[in-house]
A protein has these predicted regions:
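Glycine-rich anion-binding surface patch
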Residues: 1-203, 211-256
Length: 256
């Protein structure tokens, strides 16, 4: 009797669910297909303006199965500064604090059809822009903590307020430094400066994973209990760290 052909995927149960695996003739795992559960409770998903969005933590959970390798090229081209170490920090000349973080990351992994795909992402993390967004949000939410105005319209008292230019040096955000919320705005900004590199690389990591076809998803539909399942098909084709780094450097060099 002829031996029956082995199916492409074999069903395997494990707590708390099940996966499908494909094996080589030698019995080694070649591919894994599974539904990965994400939830709001576990902070894998957050609701932004009414839409569920996968967080960096959620992408980490998906990538444990997808297996996309994230590599930082050693150098990055920075406009006005030439070729610099990656990541690169630009300081505020007036305060010496971090003003920008510029970084590049490369995601290397296999698409659902088994092709090697390289995703190259760059980021300019502008701390002042985040400060402006925080301040405007606070002005909208808390009465009396500040205003958006032209300097020429400010009262004598308001002229002593903290001013952040927006459109030009005369029009911007005015914050009352004696208001309790002012301290919260500055505290948040200080925390971003303190952890600027970590935050920037976290954003880059999420961008690489959401653009890589091994995951390729950002928004999800939540079901009961604020949970959802994301299908992942992961190929197991080992690449050494040196090979990954060479691929990343070559991709970065071609991208400029």
């Amino acid at each position: 009797v002829a031996e029956q052909a082995k199916p492409m995927f074999e069903l395997v149960y494990f707590a708390p669910g099940r996966i499908l695996i494909s094996t080589t003739p030698e019995g080694n795992i070649q591919a894994i297909k599974a539904d990965v559960e994400l939830s709001v409770e576990n902070k894998d998903v957050v609701i932004i303006q009414g839409n569920p969005v996968i967080t960096a933590q959620g992408f980490d959970r998906l990538n444990k199965l997808a297996g996309v390798s994230l590599v930082m090229p050693s150098r990055i081209d920075v406009p006005g500064h030439g070729n610099q170490p990656n990541p690169f920090f630009i300081l505020d000349p007036a305060t010496g604090a971090i003003r920008f973080v510029m970084a590049k990351m490369v995601g290397i992994g296999y698409s659902p059809v088994g092709n090697l795909v390289i995703v190259d992402q760059s980021l300019l993390f502008d701390l002042l822009s985040y400060l402006k967004m925080d301040a405007i949000a606070k002005i909208r939410a808390v009465k009396g903590c500040g205003k958006v105005a032209n300097k020429s319209t400010l009262s004598e008292k308001e002229k002593d307020w903290f001013f952040i230019p927006i459109l030009d040096e005369n029009y911007g955000i005015c914050l009352d430094p004696l208001h309790p919320e002012f301290i919260n705005i500055i505290k948040e900004h200080t925390q971003r400066q303190r952890f600027a590199e970590r935050i920037a690389l976290g954003i880059l990591k999420r961008n690489c994973l959401r653009h890589h076809p091994a995951i390729g998803i950002m928004n999800v539909q939540l079901g009961e209990g604020g949970k959802c399942k994301v299908p992942i098909l992961a190929w197991r084709k080992d690449l050494g760290m040196e090979e990954l780094r060479k691929i990343a450097e070559d991709k970065s060099a071609r991208a400029g």
